[in-house]
Amino acid sequence: MKIGIVGAMAQEVEILKNLMADRTETRVASAVIFEGKINGKDIALLQSGIGKVAAAIGTTALLQLAKPDCVINTGSAGGVAKGLKVGDIVISDETRYHDADVTAFGYEKGQLPANPAAFLSDKKLADLAQEMAEKQGQSVKRGLICSGDSFINSEDKIAQIQADFPNVMGVEMEATAIAQVCYAFNVPFVVVRAISDGGDGKASMSFEEFLPLAAKQSSALVLGMIDRLS
């Protein structure tokens, strides 16, 4: 089995990249794909760049060139569900766009034509992620992760997203685009993100301060998953 891993920023993939043996590097547009082995497992690690378009370009290149059997999206997210704190893990059962609106033509909020309203994560991958998080003693929640091309940093923005998607756990800028590409290629995926901020007025300062912690937490969980996948 070859495991695909996607992170947007260098900080989000650095730990995993540095653990890779026999590492090679391929650049496609703004994306970088690192291939090698971690703990004897074949890994294709994508640093996609930030935002939905960069994520889609990179994930398409990853799936076409490296041909992984599954994809794990790792990194950080803003926590908007009650009880979430910095360092906690959110695992996707589904992902949706919070900034897509074709409701004028009868689609659900967040749904794009010719696509489902929600992209469902692979249950086995999500179950494994939860099992590993609990085994590592990490605080974890599962549910809806919403994506959009905005860094959410105000209570008003959170309130609007929660009004449209009451069950949202976390918000970020790539996961649903990655999920859409995986859906199109029929490749199972899951999103595993660590909370770096609360999406409120202090989000930008919190993000800068706690991104290293979020990267460490999410990378530790992904490493646990790698050891179990075969």
From Swiss-Prot:
One of its GO terms (molecular function) is methylthioadenosine nucleosidase activity. Transmembrane segments: none annotated. Its EC number is 3.2.2.9. It comes from the Bacteria. The keyword Hydrolase applies. InterPro entries: MTA_SAH_Nsdase (IPR010049), Nucleoside_phosphorylase_d (IPR000845), Nucleoside_phosphorylase_sf (IPR035994). Pfam families: PNP_UDP_1 (PF01048). SUPFAM superfamilies: Purine and uridine phosphorylases. Substrate binds at residues 78, 152, 173-174. Keywords: Amino-acid biosynthesis, Hydrolase, Methionine biosynthesis. Pathway: Amino-acid biosynthesis; L-methionine biosynthesis via salvage pathway; S-methyl-5-thio-alpha-D-ribose 1-phosphate from S-methyl-5'-thioadenosine (hydrolase route): step 1/2. It catalyses: S-adenosyl-L-homocysteine + H2O = S-(5-deoxy-D-ribos-5-yl)-L-homocysteine + adenine; S-methyl-5'-thioadenosine + H2O = 5-(methylsulfanyl)-D-ribose + adenine; 5'-deoxyadenosine + H2O = 5-deoxy-D-ribose + adenine. One of its GO terms (cellular component) is cytosol. It is an enzyme of class 3 (hydrolase). Catalyzes the irreversible cleavage of the glycosidic bond in both 5'-methylthioadenosine (MTA) and S-adenosylhomocysteine (SAH/AdoHcy) to adenine and the corresponding thioribose, 5'-methylthioribose and S-ribosylhomocysteine, respectively. Also cleaves 5'-deoxyadenosine, a toxic by-product of radical S-adenosylmethionine (SAM) enzymes, into 5-deoxyribose and adenine. Belongs to the PNP/UDP phosphorylase family. MtnN subfamily. This is 5'-methylthioadenosine/S-adenosylhomocysteine nucleosidase. It comes from Haemophilus influenzae (strain 86-028NP).
